Amino acid sequence: MKRKSGILLAVTSLPSPHGVGDFGPAAYKFIDLLAKHKQKMWQILPLNPMGYGNSPYQPYGSKPFDELYISLELLQKDKLLPKRIRKFQPKSVRVDFQKVRTFKEGYLRKAYAKFLKEKRRGFKAWFKRNKWVYNYALFLTLKKENQLNSWLYWPEEHKNVLNGNVDLSPFKDEINFTMWLQFIAFKQWNKLHRYAKNNKIDIVGDIPIYVGVDSIDVFENREVFLLDGRSFPTHIAGVPPDYFSKTGQRWGNPLYDWDHLVNTKFAFWKDRLGFNAELFDYIRIDHFRAFDTYYKIPEWAPTAETGEWVEAPGYAFFDEILATFPHLKIIAEDLGDLRPEVLKLRDHYNFPGMEIVQFTYQGSKTKPEKYHTTNRIIYPGTHDNQTTYGWFGALEKEEQRDIVSDLARRGFNYDSVIDQLLAYTFASDADIAIIPMQDVLSLDDRARFNVPGTIGSPNWEWKLKDFKETKLRLPFIEFLTKKYNR
């Protein structure tokens, strides 16, 4: 793999006149900035409909996009909205998800009404290639009808609507509107992705290994998951207690019925990965270790202290997937305390893994050897870490002195220790270096994007108010890119 570098920035974090980043002009501007400053990759977070706590990792579906990503500015350009529309929190550095949804929905319904009135084309042809969207639209419409409650608590006729015994005529308009939103979102994304390709920028997509229980994935594929007779999960995903959490993490996602997946030649996953392979150039699979061993928590257990590790058919899985999609570019999120078999699985398929400077950097002390290859992606931190500024500031003074001393010994003599750590990242022998935007800008922990194991605000809310500071900092990133041959 050629040495290269890029930036990690959630689409929601882009500047916007309408309260949340989207697929509009700011996304194109960001690609321009990446290309101008010699970057080759843009890593994003999942684009699916955000579920509980506005988390992109608890989506209502693994195929659909969240309608928040639809750009009102592009709808104006398409003359589906008037030239002048109201702005919404354009200079905010946080996304107010509930308010921005209400704000954008009104304009999206107006655009849809005009689309119908003018009898515009394109939707029917798109729908023929994307029949999955009907069940999702039906699911979301019934979810609204049931006050957004989980489908597990819907009336039986709604819970089993896919059996075909329900009169859906009262919901026809809302179903059609929801399908149209997906048509527009995918149209805007595909155009943006082509623009990135034309500028030689690879998009790194992100797929959570698990899906949320309150999702179309579970709703229409109940046989794929470990559920009881009422469709409730019998066991759920998470991780056991460790240094960071005394009771572990109880994520709540339903676990796969791996016997069923094996018997169906992993059809559910083939559909999912094949779909995403058309949207992104690389796919980062979150919690890769679960393809080797996954943690199985009884649903009744209040914490992750009660659970067991169970082996998964990782080799059979990837043999089948790669036979079907031989050119699939997978990045393995292989962080944490792993058994050697996880790394063997990763290396057997030559998947690049991840290295986090905050985890592995130990100043003048010996670094733990997790890799014996350049085939990895190095980050100062990810969306789940403190910002590098916040992390360094929280260290003991002695640790800070050790790191500063060691960076100087290695020849990283820049204006700030954050810039020295960025240089350390770029100088690594890892093939790819990716820097979170918060670290490009040397921001403190007020800009931290997510704290694992916590739910709700301020997670996922940070955004740029504009590109002014970004433009000032990117020349330094370009300098490091050239200096370290990326």
Model feature map: region roles:
Residues 25-50, 278-280:
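Catalytic domains of carbohydrate-active enzymes, especially glycoside hydrolases
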Residues 1-12, 28:
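N-terminal regions that are enriched for targeting/export leaders
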Residues 474-486:
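C-terminal accessory segments of extracellular proteins
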Residues 35, 189-199, 322, 346-347:
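Surface-exposed amphipathic alpha-helices with a cationic face
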Residues 7-9, 22, 44:
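Active-site-adjacent substrate/metal-binding segments within catalytic domains
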Residues 10, 16, 54-186, 211-434, ...:
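Alpha-amylase-like alpha-glycosidases and glucanotransferases acting on alpha-linked glucans and related
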Residues 45, 202-204, 208, 282, ...:
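Outer-envelope exported proteins of Gram-negative bacteria
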